[in-house]
Amino acid sequence: GQSMADTFNMLRANDLIWSFFVNNYLLGKEPKPFDLLFWNSDQTRMPKALHMFYLRKFYGENALSKGELVMDNVKLDLSTVKTPVYVQSSKEDHIAPARSVYRGAKLFGGPVTFTLSGSGHIAGVINAPVARKYQHWTNADMPDTVEAWMTGTTETPGSWWPHWLNWLSEKSGGQVPARDPAKGPLKPLEDAPGSYVKVKS
């Protein structure tokens, strides 16, 4: 997990490495509490073999987009996915640039809704409507490039979440009562949120 985080931090070293070195180490300033950065610093633990497979196949070889990725002897072909897909990208994302995400969205064989949000990799996604921050862009058409897509967009202030919720509601059945895990065939392990969320990597 830490190796993956270090890799992503190096993509924006001035903001995510050197600013902390200068402010915290050289100037002795205490870092201000920031919920998104606290959450971001709790990396996902990943076995080395999976980490290497992920980097090699998805970044080095771009195997999924080429239709060459094989999992358990099955070749994955996104063009065979015919169900509706909602794809969100962030305008200033340094890890998954909007141009790349858009190209990936074009690989699906069914209807795709692409939405672009303001801000970057984390704040562009984790943007609750109550915050009234940033904006998002929508366009029902999917032209060849994200630049062409942008020329036909509608800009809406605030979070992209309500747009996504409307999309989900149109494709979902009616609401049902939440299930009670204690009444299922398996005994619950423990109360929510679970001890695993308290484990630091």
Task: Mark where each language-model region is.
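Catalytic active-site module of serine/aspartate enzymes centered on a nucleophile-bearing elbow/loop
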Residues: 113-201
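Short beta-strand/loop motif that positions the catalytic acidic residue
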Residues: 81, 87-89, 93
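Acidic catalytic loop of the alpha/beta-hydrolase fold
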Residues: 92-96, 121-123
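The feature captures the conserved acid-bearing segment of alpha/beta-hydrolase catalytic domains
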Residues: 71-82
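Short alpha-helix in the alpha/beta-hydrolase fold that links the catalytic acid
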Residues: 97-107, 118
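Alpha/beta-hydrolase-fold enzymes
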Residues: 1-52, 57, 63, 169-201
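Short acidic (Asp/Glu) and glycine-rich catalytic loops that position anionic groups and cofactors
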Residues: 29-37, 81-83, 140-145
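Hydrophobic, well-ordered secondary-structure elements that form the walls
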Residues: 55, 104, 164
